Structure formats: C-alpha cells, structure tokens
Regions:
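Short proline/glycine- and basic residue-enriched helix-capping loop/turn segments at helix->loop/beta transitions
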Residues: 340
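Domain-core detector
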Residues: 1-182, 192-289, 293-301, 313-334, ...
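A short, surface-exposed interaction/processing loop segment used at functional sites
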Residues: 363-394
C-alpha cells in the first residue's frame, strides 16, 4: 500500500464533531476514517481526500491542493465565521488547510514506513529507532520531557527505543506508533541498527531480534474496532450514533467502524444490506409534509447490496434524452449516507415516498428515492445541472 492508496481507502466521515471529540475516540475507530474537525459535508471531505492523496503521490503541490479545496468550499457555500476568519477554525484559511494536508500526508507516509520497518527482516537489522526532529519550529515542544514523562529512556542524549516499545504509542496524540506524533510537531523517527543499539546499551549483544505482535501490525483491509473510552462509554456511544448512524456499530463497550460499508458492498463484499438508521434531525427539518415527516421519524432506511449493484450497472454510462442521466461513480454511492442524513432538499414523491437531492461538485445533482413505509430505496440517479469547475474522484 502506498501513502496515496491509504488516504483514498479511508471512508468519508462527515461529522460536526470538534477536535476534542475526535481525540476522545480510540485510534482503532479513527484509523479507517477520513475526517477533519467540524466538517459535516461529505462533498467537501471527498475533495479534501482526493487532493491530499495527490499531494502524497506527488501529483499536486500543497498550494495546488489548497486551491482545489477552496474551490470546493466555495461551491458548497462555505463562509467562515467572521470572528474565526483566517484562523484554524476557518476551513478556507491557509493554516487550517496546511494542517489538513500536511497531517494526513505525514500520517499516511508514517504508516507505510512503519509497516516496512517492522517486518521480520527489518527488525533483525534495525531493531530500534530514534525520535528526532525533522523540521524546525519557532516554539518547539519539549520532546525529551514528553519522552521521559511517558517512561522513555535517554541514551547518550538520544531518545531511542525498540520499535516494539509502547513508548511510541504513548507519546502520540493520535494513538499510533508512527509519526506524526502531534499536530505540527516536526518530529519523526530514524532507524537505529543492531550494532548501534548494542553500543548505546539499548539492547544486549545476545538479545534476539524483537518480534512485532500481529495485533500491532495493522491490517487496513480488516474492519477496525476498539473499546469505548473508559468512564465515557455512554457519552461516546451517543456521540457516535448521532454523528455516523450505521457507519459505526456498537456492542457492549466495543465499537466497530463500518465507514467503508458502501464501497465494500459495491465490490460484492461486506454485509448484504446497509442499515442507515432513522432520519436525522437535519432531514426531518427539511420535510414540509406532515405525513411524510411522521414516517421519516418512525422508520429507518436500509440499502440492499443487490439494489446498489443493479443501479451501478444501470448507470455505468450516460443515459436518457441527451445523456441527461450521468454515470454513477463509487464516490456518488458513498454520498448516500449524507443524502439520507442531510440532503439539500427533501420533497414528497408519491404515497409514502420521499425524494432527496444533493448537488455534487462535478456539476451534477444526485437524487435518491425512498419508500418510507418499507424503509428501502427506490431510485438513484445523477443529472447534470451546470458546467463543473472541479471534478472529485469517485
């Protein structure tokens, strides 16, 4: 897996949750999600994910990525709060965009390097690594104190530990044993060979090569699960259900991220049906018809895998008069949870049916028909409404 592939494999996690809320969620749940604090529009996240992946692969510069994201923000009507303009809470500011781009690119590269550096052969030759500064900072954090405060040892003035040591996860704001270890920290790692590690006394000459337990070598193709934060189980449970609905399943004190559910189902895997849950408050507020509103409040929506695959085949190519119906991409199907939770419009369409619409950033408008009495989708199509100025990848 390349850094760009890791980024594109992450499921869009549109949510109004703030940074502190995300930080309270265990790393196992955050790891499969592409998110940014308070970004609750999946269309914006889709462009951010694509732009960040292109920076990771070298196909875009950071300045070009900022431009693409700003265009998407403008198209979706984003206006920063007047008192937050230019700061980190302004999604269009250079500070916020640099944070999004640089943190995600660094995380993806750190993840790939971690997998390479913890293979059996790599651990035999380079059993340890050193925490080092890779970028200067005007006001650097005191990393030696952070290191020692979490139980790390100093060897000849250097912060060195086995790659399998818990210290790497302990010093990380994100709960990962690979860099970055904090927002804008400027810190990275350097491999330390066996001879050098013996010379500094980190390991003994007769110590066998360390072995990385399988559970510490993350498999990105597996559904990730983690325990809810101890003492905050109920609070976190409610927060996750409100923000993501069926994208997170919770059993007891364990929560599992199902954010890639839609893509997995389109590919023929995953569950036979995706349960998106009951209508959100945002959707209810958009429904004017009282009878339809009552049905939406009562019944949820379940998306069958066969229905999705049928519509994917049906809309592989333009259809209708003058090609009015556009092809549906994987990215379009990924927007179904957003269509259900927070559409641009929701109108009655027949007896017990609701038609939801959402404008896309490539000049189209997605329309999802829902039979509220049965809690199932009826139609799904995309039509062109304007000339696109930016085309996000599906």
């Amino acid at each position: 897996m390349t850094p760009a592939e890791r980024i594109l494999a992450k499921a869009l996690a549109a949510s109004p949750m703030k940074s502190a809320d995300w930080s309270s969620i265990q790393a196992g749940l955050r790891d499969r999600a592409f998110f940014s604090a308070t970004v609750d529009d999946a269309r914006r996240l889709a462009v951010m994910r694509e732009a960040v992946a292109k920076v990771a692969s070298g196909d875009l510069s950071e300045s070009q990525a900022r431009l693409e994201i700003r265009e998407a923000l403008e198209q979706t009507g984003y206006t920063p709060p007047q008192d937050k303009k230019g700061g980190l809470q302004d999604l269009s500011s250079q500070r916020r965009l640099d944070l999004i781009i640089q943190t995600n690119v660094a995380e993806a590269r750190g993840y790939v390097r971690y997998l390479e550096g913890t293979s059996e052969g790599a651990l035999a030759a380079f059993p340890c690594q050193e925490l080092v500064r890779v970028q200067g900072r005007k006001a650097p954090r005191n990393w030696p104190e952070i290191w020692k405060g979490h139980g790390g040892q100093i060897y000849g003035g250097r912060m060195i530990a086995l790659k399998t040591d818990e210290i790497w996860t302990a010093i990380s704001r994100f709960g990962h044993p690979w860099p970055p270890f904090d927002f804008g920290s400027g810190m990275g790692v350097r491999d330390v060979g066996r001879r050098e590690a013996i010379r500094y006394g980190v390991i003994a000459a007769d110590d066998p090569p360390p072995k990385m337990p399988p559970e510490k070598r993350p498999n990105f193709n597996e559904n990730l699960a983690d325990r809810l934060p101890k003492g905050r189980e109920k609070e976190t449970d409610l927060m996750l259900r409100e923000a993501f609905g069926a994208q997170v399943s919770i059993e007891g004190d364990m929560a599992k991220w199902n954010g890639s559910l839609i893509r997995d189902m389109l590919a023929g895997g995953g569950t036979p049906r995706a349960r998106l849950g009951r209508a959100s408050g945002a959707l209810i507020a958009r429904i004017e018809d009282e009878d339809i509103r009552s049905l939406a409040e009562k019944n949820g929506l379940t998306i069958p895998r066969q229905w999705m695959q049928t519509h994917a085949l049906k809309h592989e190519k333009p259809s209708g008069k003058g090609g009015a119906n556009l092809p549906l991409s994987t990215g379009d199907f990924e927007l179904i949870p957003s269509l259900w939770r927070c559409p641009d419009s929701a109108t009655r369409h027949g007896d017990g049916e609701l038609e939801l619409s959402l404008e896309t950033l490539d000049g189209g408008i997605l329309t999802l028909g829902v039979n509220l009495s049965k809690g199932t989708p009826t139609t799904f199509h995309k039509r062109k409404t304007r000339a696109p100025s930016h085309s996000p990848k599906g």
